[in-house]
From Swiss-Prot:
Annotated signal peptide: 1-31
Underlying gene: Prss57
PTM (free text): After cleavage of the signal peptide, the N-terminus is probably further processed by CTSC. Processing by CTSC is probably required for accumulation in cytoplasmic granules; in the absence of CTSC the protein does not accumulate. N-glycosylated.
SUPFAM superfamilies, sorted: Trypsin-like serine proteases
Top-level taxonomic group: Eukaryota
Native source organism of the sequence: Rattus norvegicus (Rat)
Residue positions the entry lists as glycosylated: N129
Protein name: Serine protease 57
Cell location: Cytoplasmic granule lumen; Secreted
C-alpha cells in the first residue's frame, strides 16, 4: 500500500492480517510441506500410507500390520472415515502406479484420551477393509519395543510426507523426506510455553536452516533407527522454525495400547484391496 492512501479501512485490514499471521497453522490445514528435504528414491519408504479424502491427500500414516495403519487422531476430527481411502505402495500420488494398493477404512480407533485443543495423545489406528499384500513397494515399519525409551537428544531421525513443497501449495513430485534431530523435551516445552505433555517428542534441524514438517504431513512417522518413534502432530506458523520446534506424538508411550486394540478387533476379509492399474 502506498503511504497516505487507503485510509483507515486499509489500516484495519493490515492490522487484522498481521494478527492472523501470529496464529499457528491448524493441523491438517492446507499449504503445508516438508521443509528443506529431498525426494526419496521411489518406494524407498514402503511403509508410507496416504490418507485420502475426495481424491486429495489429507494426512500421512504408516503400515505396521497387514490390516492396520497408524496415523494422527486430529486428521479425523472433522472427517467421515467411511469416505476416506488409504493408499499404500505410492511414490507420486498424482500418477497411477501399478504398485499402489487402495483400501477403504473399516474403522478408526482414536486414543480415548485424545485432546484436540492441546493435541495430547494425538494417535489413532486405521483398520483397513482388507489385507495389504506385502512386497518391495509395501512393507511394515516396526514399532518401538514395549517399555522402550524415546530417542535421546541429538539422535538423527527422518520424517517423510506428501505435503506441498512451497507456501503456494505446490504438490511434490513424489514422497519427500528430511533429516532432523531429536530435541530435549524440556527445551522444546520452553519454546512452546509449557504446552507439551510427556508423551510428545520434538525435533529441530540441528543448525540454523529450516528443516522439518508442516501439518499436511500429519500422521506420518518419525523414523529413528528403523523404528517409528514419532507421529507428526503439530508445528508453528513457520515450518521448521527453531523458535517453535516440530512436535510429534511419542509412539513408545502407546505401544501397549496399540497392540491391545489390534488384538481386540476382528480381522477383516482379504478382498477389500484394489490394485491400481497403470
Amino acid at each position: 500500500m502506498v503511504p497516505g492512501t487507503g485510509g483507515g479501512r486499509d489500516c484495519l485490514t493490515l492490522v487484522v492480517a498481521t494478527a492472523l499471521t501470529q496464529l499457528l497453522w491448524l493441523p491438517g490445514c492446507c499449504g503445508s510441506h516438508i521443509v528443506g528435504g529431498h525426494e526419496v528414491k521411489p518406494h524407498a519408504r514402503p511403509y508410507m500410507a496416504s490418507v485420502n479424502f475426495e481424491g486429495h491427500h489429507h494426512c500421512g500414516g504408516f503400515l505396521f500390520h497387514a490390516h492396520w495403519v497408524l496415523s494422527a487422531a486430529h486428521c479425523f476430527s472433522d472427517r467421515d472415515p467411511s469416505t476416506g481411502l488409504v493408499v499404500l505402495g505410492a511414490h507420486a500420488l498424482l500418477t497411477p502406479e501399478p504398485t499402489q494398493q487402495v483400501f477403504g477404512i473399516a474403522a478408526v480407533v482414536s486414543h480415548p484420551d485424545f485432546e484436540p485443543t492441546t493435541q495430547a495423545n494425538d494417535i489413532c489406528l486405521l483398520r483397513l477393509n482388507g489385507s495389504a499384500v506385502l512386497g518391495p513397494a509395501v512393507r511394515l515399519l516396526r514399532l518401538p519395543r514395549r517399555g522402550a525409551k524415546p530417542p535421546v537428544a541429538g539422535t538423527r531421525c527422518r520424517v517423510s510426507g506428501w505435503g506441498s513443497v512451497s507456501d503456494f501449495e505446490e504438490p511434490p513430485p513424489g514422497l519427500m523426506e528430511v533429516e532432523v534431530r531429536i530435541l530435549d523435551l524440556s527445551v522444546c516445552n520452553s519454546s512452546w510455553q509449557g504446552q507439551l505433555s510427556p508423551a510428545m517428542l520434538c525435533t529441530h534441524s540441528g543448525d540454523r536452516r529450516r528443516r522439518g514438517f508442516c501439518s499436511a504431513d500429519s500422521g506420518g512417522p518419525l523414523v529413528c533407527g528403523n523404528r517409528a518413534h514419532g507421529l507428526v502432530s503439530f508445528s508453528g506458523l513457520w515450518c521448521g522454525d527453531p523458535k517453535t520446534p516440530d512436535v510429534y506424538t511419542q509412539v513408545s508411550a502407546f505401544v501397549s495400547w496399540i497392540w491391545d486394540v489390534v488384538r481386540a478387533s476382528p480381522t477383516p476379509g482379504s478382498m477389500g484391496c484394489s490394485l491400481r492399474a497403470v
